[in-house]
From Swiss-Prot:
Protein name (record): Xylose isomerase
InterPro entries in the record: Xyl_isomerase-like_sf (IPR036237), Xyl_isomerase-like_TIM-brl (IPR013022), XylA_actinobac (IPR013453), Xylose_isomerase (IPR001998)
Domain of life of the source: Bacteria
GO MF terms held by the record: magnesium ion binding; xylose isomerase activity
GTP-binding recorded as keyword: no
Enzyme class: isomerase
Organism the protein comes from: Streptomyces murinus
Pfam families: AP_endonuc_2
Assembly and binders: Homotetramer.
Length: 388
């Protein structure tokens, strides 16, 4: 298998990823700003399928209408020249100080109304550029202290905002769905809708739940100590995996945004295995930050590494699934039984079945090993290149 990416792999990057200048709470930028046009050109050369953007990534905050149109025109020309697409867009409701207490859930009503108008304006541009998904990350929607935010009221305002955006998209006839991106904390001390499970539950309360799904990010779920492939599996099970952000994270700490494959490599293996076998057809979107130690050569090497690592893991996962010994081990671990209904014969038959309870040999069942360790070692062998 070739590990050279092509547009058919559907790899995408945010302008803010390779464009991150390395500025953090403890240090200034280590790289100059990157022109979005150059980003499009370089990512196309690397084999990417598309780019994504926050409104302020493409059009600097405070630009005049004339300046705005100029930025859009240059960006569109770069897309046309390279064949790159814009599958997703989003709104920056976190950088400007006006959003210090959030956008959709700010206590200040005027700020909430401004946040909605800013979002609607970029939805128009997203639709114009052909985006099919609109991500919403509420990085400032939260609090640091208990009395600062009535969470029930804040969730009401969050629901109101998404319902209004759904109403707008429907009225305009846009072929666009929303993907909520959970995160437990950072930059706020505690962020609303902190995990995939919280977001899935919230979506069911919206007026048009069919328009809303999730955009889970590797590092965000792992910051909460959760199993990312399990969260993705539940989102797929619910039919709500509308988008995904791929990166690397090493345990419960700040949001590292490492290139994909760095950090928890085992989780990355199982994630790719899941995406490639579960029928996920969306972009494989990288939301990472090249370390501030790197110059631009390092930036592009990091971006290329994201795609290469995904393709290597895809190859390893396919070899794992095709291995006859693995298939035998899967049966020994009774995965085929898990796929069978527990009581397809119905409740009455279950209650009448003495073998299910009265005559069930609990001790014999308890003594049966599950053979999980052998199966897991086969996975490790494939991941580490010792098999296949």
């Amino acid at each position: 298998m070739s590990f050279q990416p092509t547009p058919e792999d559907r790899f995408t990057f945010g302008l803010w990823t390779v464009g991150w200048q390395g500025r953090d709470p403890f240090g200034d930028a280590t790289r100059p700003a990157l022109d979005p046009v150059e980003t499009v050109q370089r990512l196309a050369e690397l084999g990417a399928y598309g780019v994504t953007f926050h409104d302020d990534d493409l059009i600097p905050f405070g630009s005049s209408d004339t300046e705005r149109e100029s930025h859009i025109k240059r960006f569109r020309q770069a897309l046309d020249a390279t064949g790159m697409t814009v599958p997703m867009a989003t709104t920056n409701l976190f950088t400007h100080p006006v959003f210090k207490d959030g956008g959709f859930t700010a206590n200040d009503r005027d700020v909430r109304r401004y946040a909605l108008r800013k979002t609607i304006g970029n939805i128009d541009l997203a639709a114009e550029l052909g985006a099919k998904t609109y991500v919403a990350w509420g990085g400032r929607e939260g609090a640091e202290s208990g009395g600062a935010k009535d969470v029930r009221d804040a969730l009401d305002r969050m629901k109101e905002a998404f319902d209004l955006l759904g109403e707008y998209v429907t009225a305009q006839g846009y072929d666009l769905r929303f993907a909520i991106e959970p995160k437990p904390n950072e930059p706020r001390g505690d962020i609303l809708l902190p995990t995939v499970g919280h977001a899935l539950a919230f979506i069911e309360r919206l007026e048009r739940p069919e328009l809303y799904g999730v955009n889970p990010e590797v590092g965000h779920e792992q910051m909460a100590g959760l199993n990312f492939p399990h969260g993705i599996a539940q989102a797929l099970w619910a039919g709500k995996l509308f988008h995904i952000d791929l990166n690397g994270q090493s345990g419960i700490k700040y949001d590292q945004d490492l290139r994909f494959g760095a950090g928890d490599l085992r989780a990355a293996f199982w994630l790719v295995d899941l995406l490639e076998t579960a029928g996920y057809e969306g972009p494989r979107h990288f939301d990472f930050k090249p370390p501030r130690t790197e110059d631009f050569d390092g930036v592009w090497a990091s971006a290329a590494g994201c795609m290469r690592n995904y393709l290597i893991l895809k190859d390893r996962a396919a070899a794992f699934r095709a291995d006859p010994e693995v298939q035998e081990a899967l049966r020994a671990a009774r995965l085929d039984q898990l796929a069978q209904p527990t009581a397809a014969d119905g409740l009455d038959a279950l209650l009448a079945d003495r073998a299910a309870f009265e005559d069930f040999d609990v001790d014999a069942a308890a003594a049966r090993g599950m053979a999980f360790e052998h199966l897991d070692q086969l996975a490790m062998d494939h991941l580490l290149g010792a098999r296949g």
